[in-house]
Amino acid sequence: MFYGRYISKLILCLCLSSMLQSCVAIASLGVGVIGVSAIQRPQIQDNINDNKIYSLINLALVKRFNKLYKKLYIQVLYGRVLLIGNIASQEDMLDILDIVWGIDGVVEVINELNIKENSNYFDSKQYFKDTYITLSIRSKLVNASHIQSLMYNVTVIDNVVYLFGIARNLEELEEVSSIAANAKGITDVKNHILMKDDLNK
């Protein structure tokens, strides 16, 4: 099985996680209730604004959704908010979207939330598999000389890869996308990478 073959590799990858944390800044509140992250960028003021946005989102969602099985990944880039995770109902999804849109500074909400009946169930095997895929992609981004890895977030849930960040040019975008698409064990890639030139328009 996948897990038997890769568990030793996963352990090795986890040993590298402290190094790879420089790629993505992730903070959690509670026991995995909500994960939030902001992509690191050289523009200090933009980072401050994004940090404020995801902090406000985090606080609002913790206040509204106090059940510990809720697990969302919220990423913010230039006011664009990417929501990733499994939730229990359409009602919860609408509440989450309403809360996020109500935060000052949010200019776009990218909804990658999935309704999953057993979203409160923690599947340890799937978690280890997703973690292995995530770390393997991140390590390749770090080692790719033509990729500015600090500009990308990689999130994997249920074998689906979610990419978020800023590509300096088309070649870098294609290389990042290719690394994710060729990762072993994935079923899909959701690409939400911005082109640097588009930000200047």
Model regions: which residues?
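N-terminal targeting leaders
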Residues: 2-8, 14, 20-201
